[in-house]
Regions:
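Structured catalytic-domain cores with a bias toward divalent-metal coordination
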Residues: 1-316
């Protein structure tokens, strides 16, 4: 039986003051230091019901953040979905037509298919092509510990370690349903100097989720060289728990219309024995492939073609 969504403890900020931006793209603002350096992007609202990113960008604007070197861009991505957010029905505004974070490959962006999210992704693409370092702020359905999704490239793992939070780093290849923004172009290319991180800050509407998003953003900006050295050193010296790394080996993609887990998994459960049944996909048993298998982000959106859960193991 479906459970009621958690209480909404966060207030969706008014982002209308940022609509004009200064890039020619609505809701996208860039600050150029006039000095050589990297182009750093902090992205929020890939999904319209993930409030922590909007709260974080609103706070950065209010604090008058400016880069010491290079360029800093703050982007509210799926504004059309965000406008539909209703605390009385908080799960309904993830997207308008389709998932904004499954569109980021050349074939999809260059294709003929149309949707509200594709139109926005295509509008943002020229700017994203100029970005060197990306932090994409997200949150999760479940009340699960925060995760830093670093992809497979060593450069992004190194960046995640420099940021220092959250405690769990996940190395994964993404989803069969489509490419994420953090996997686009040079971000996922080991030969490119570009790097990207996607942080899942906690459950969508819990207060600590917004706090973690803000802390991660400040530490990312410090690690990226956006802040003055003394300020960056102060931020990065703040206590953080030792990080652990989960390497994802399998993504369970739903093949049929009747998929259900055997338990109410929330994420980061460690299943001791290989061969343990964790779900049924229209009668097909889904089993853990090895001992001490870690479940990453089990989904409540159990739809054909979508990722039900990722399976991994702790490597560090």
């Amino acid at each position: 039986m479906p459970t009621a969504p958690p209480a909404v403890e966060l207030a969706a900020p008014d982002i209308a003051p940022y609509a004009a931006g200064n890039t020619g793209i609505p809701y996208v603002t860039s600050f150029d230091s006039g000095r050589p350096g990297r182009h750093v992007l902090v992205n929020a609202l890939a999904h319209g019901n993930e409030l922590c990113g909007a709260i974080t960008l609103d706070e950065l604007f209010r604090r008058g953040i400016r880069p010491l070197a290079g360029k800093l861009t703050l982007c509210f991505a799926n504004v059309a979905a965000y406008r539909r957010f209703d605390p009385a029905s908080p799960t309904a505004s993830r997207f308008v037509d389709e998932d904004f974070n499954r569109l980021w490959d050349a074939a999809t962006l260059d294709g003929k298919r149309q949707s509200a999210e594709l139109a926005r992704a295509r509008a943002l693409r020229p700017l994203v092509d100029t970005v060197d370092l990306l932090l994409d702020l997200h949150s999760m359905q479940q009340a699960s510990p925060p995760l830093m999704l670093a992809g497979l490239a060593d450069k992004s793992l190194a960046l995640a370690r420099r940021v220092g939070v959250p405690e769990i780093i996940v190395r994964d290849a993404g989803h069969a349903a489509g490419a994420r923004l953090r996997d686009y172009g040079g971000f996922a290319d080991p030969a490119s100097p570009k790097a990207a991180l996607l942080v899942e800050c906690g459950q969508h509407w819990e207060r600590p989720t917004a706090e973690l998003a803000m802390a991660t953003a400040w530490r990312f900006l410090a690690a990226a060289g956006v802040l003055a050295p003394a300020e960056a050193a102060r931020i990065l010296a703040q206590p953080a728990k030792p990080q652990r790394v989960v390497a994802v080996t399998d993504a369970v993609t739903i093949a049929n219309d009747r998929f259900e887990f055997t338990e109410d998994f929330r994420g980061l459960e460690v299943i001791a024995r290989a061969g343990t049944v964790i779900a049924h996909d229209d009668g097909r048993e889904i089993r853990t492939p090895y001992d001490d298998c870690v479940l990453i982000m089990p989904s409540r959106r159990l739809l054909r073609g979508q990722t039900a859960v990722r399976l991994g193991r702790f490597t560090a």
